[in-house]
């Protein structure tokens, strides 16, 4: 059946949570520079990848699929620091000043709205540009008004909300997350132990008919309550946790081992990172959220229950170390102990000197554009087709058929 897709007319507002962060400013600068012809959108599937047509001709995806043109994007968002996007990008030190100056006027015009923030969910951050709300429900109402105001002020036809802020502390799924009614009650009761700021952003976005993308490993839209709400409002949700650096390498190597039926005894991964993300993850409660996300990758690929002789006893360790001198230039080391024919051992060492935000920025842009496409195509709920971009891709348990034994 042919899918009817509404055209990408008018302006698309992209509201970023953490708009002054390294990932957000890098994405914004690159997008603005690309549409001025000052840079190429390297790493962006929506902008550079091709698809094969019926006659074997290759065409750019953006020339076939009705994606929003970069010229029609308007950026805005929230941040716990008041700096405009130019000042924030200078602070992040991801990009050279000469690359910022080409779009300086546009960056200076992007001023963050006060953020919905709770210090208890990111203890290493101490922002001053913060909303005052008596309850989580009031926080949601303020965010909804922000979305409406931005949409009207910038004459936007559509909005996408993107979480590019820090990783929140780890919390397990609880009763308050199991239904929309329970979630809303917890927000109104101001249950700050189980309702995170990111959940308030997600709820506000969905309530305003805006797709929501979760770029961190937070427990947020991967809950039955949010699945229910997104379907009720016919809004797409996507996530979670951008698959950009070390985990990207894992998802390349692990399928190779499995395809060749090579066994794995152990996989040790460590990183050093010096940006605000690294600072937040230096707190054990926040690191646990990231650790759970990063550890989940290889089990899903290896299927140890199916191949116990090869992957039934893999020792998998992940560490992230805050090291300020490196700033955004993350370095990742992996030691992989594998075994082959007749059980003989071998080792693989991977040393990836990467730029964290340079890898994440095009992922963020692609998820925004594809989420907007999904909205115009009438798709709602979890967008499993966007799993490729995420460390912990979400899935709706109600869609999984479990056979009776």
Predicted regions mapped to residue ranges:
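N-terminal Rossmann-like NAD(P) cofactor-binding subdomain of oxidoreductases
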Residues: 2, 10-19, 23-251, 255-256, ...
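Active-site-lining helix/loop region of Rossmann-like oxidoreductase modules
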Residues: 15-18, 22, 228, 246-384
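Generic structural "secondary-structure junction" signal
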Residues: 25, 221, 322-325, 388-392
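Residue-level signal for secondary-structure boundary elements
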Residues: 39-40, 155, 376-379, 394, ...
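C-terminal non-catalytic interaction/assembly regions of soluble proteins
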Residues: 373, 385-398
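Residue-level detector of conserved catalytic or cofactor/ligand-binding positions
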Residues: 398-405
């Amino acid at each position: 059946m042919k899918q009817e897709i509404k055209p990408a007319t008018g302006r698309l507002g992209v509201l970023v949570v953490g708009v002054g962060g390294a990932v957000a400013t890098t994405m914004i600068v690159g997008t603005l520079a690309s549409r001025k012809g000052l840079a190429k959108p390297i790493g962006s599937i929506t902008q550079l990848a091709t698809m094969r047509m019926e006659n074997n001709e290759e065409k750019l995806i953006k020339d076939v699929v009705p994606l929003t043109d970069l010229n029609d994007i308007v950026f805005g968002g929230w941040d716990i620091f008041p700096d405009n996007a130019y000042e924030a990008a200078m602070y992040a030190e991801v990009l050279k000043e000469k690359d910022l100056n080409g779009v300086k006027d546009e960056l200076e015009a992007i001023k963050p709205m006060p953020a919905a923030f709770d210090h208890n969910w990111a203890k290493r951050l101490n922002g001053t540009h913060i909303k005052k709300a008596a309850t989580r429900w009031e926080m949601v109402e303020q965010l909804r008004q922000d979305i409406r105001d931005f949409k009207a002020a910038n004459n936007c036809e559509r909005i996408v909300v993107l979480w590019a802020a820090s990783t929140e502390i780890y919390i397990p799924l609880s009763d308050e997350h199991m239904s929309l009614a329970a979630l809303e009650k917890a927000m109104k009761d101001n249950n700050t132990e189980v309702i995170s700021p990111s959940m308030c952003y997600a709820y506000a976005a969905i309530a305003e008919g805006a797709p929501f993308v979760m770029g961190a490993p937070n427990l947020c839209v991967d809950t039955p309550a949010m699945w229910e709400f997104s379907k009720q409002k016919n809004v797409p949700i996507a996530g979670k946790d951008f698959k950009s650096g070390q985990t990207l390498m894992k998802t390349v190597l692990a399928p190779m081992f499995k395809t060749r039926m090579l066994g794995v005894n152990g996989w040790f991964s460590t990183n050093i990172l010096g940006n605000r993300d690294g600072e937040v993850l230096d707190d054990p409660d926040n690191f646990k959220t990231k650790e759970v996300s990063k550890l989940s990758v290889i089990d899903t690929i290896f299927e140890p229950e199916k191949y116990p002789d090869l992957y039934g006893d893999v020792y998998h360790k992940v560490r992230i170390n805050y090291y300020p001198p490196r700033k955004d230039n993350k370095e990742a080391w992996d030691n992989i102990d594998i075994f082959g024919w007749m059980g003989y051992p071998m080792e693989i060492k991977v040393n990836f000197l990467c730029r964290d935000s340079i890898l994440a920025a095009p992922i963020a842009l692609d998820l925004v554009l594809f989420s907007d496409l999904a909205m115009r195509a009438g798709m709602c709920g979890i967008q499993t087709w966007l799993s490729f971009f995420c460390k912990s891709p979400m899935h709706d348990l109600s869609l999984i058929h479990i056979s009776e034994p």
